[in-house]
């Protein structure tokens, strides 16, 4: 049995398809974050991009997400050192720090079901940005570095 690519390759060595498959589809990166100007601490909100499907935790227009005018960021290998804003459970962040994938990750389980069952996605937890006046009222957790 061969070693899975995420255990045998660095992030830089992965193909585009392998890189894309690391995303568990939790939707947490589609939540707006706030940064404390004094401490640079990052705070997550439950305020989501209007393109996020709240049931599937996927972008409603994934192929065109960078041209839709939204603030969607492309995660690229040359920005790995900037991934501290991603959730602690993000495969890009975990593997970039020499850690392993969580047991519920779709690459290990074959589907998103275990991720949703482990309460690791944003399913049922979001409000859309168009419905929010003060994002500070929607802070849900702080990233842990």
Swiss-Prot record:
Organism: Vibrio cholerae serotype O1 (strain ATCC 39315 / El Tor Inaba N16961)
Name of this chain's protein: UPF0260 protein VC_1058
Signal peptide per UniProt: none
Pfam families per UniProt: CxxCxxCC
Alphabetical list of HAMAP family matching this protein: UPF0260
Domain of life: Bacteria
InterPro entries documented for this protein: Puta_zinc/iron-chelating_dom, UCP006173
Taxonomic placement: Bacteria, Pseudomonadati, Pseudomonadota, Gammaproteobacteria, Vibrionales
Family according to the record: Belongs to the UPF0260 family.
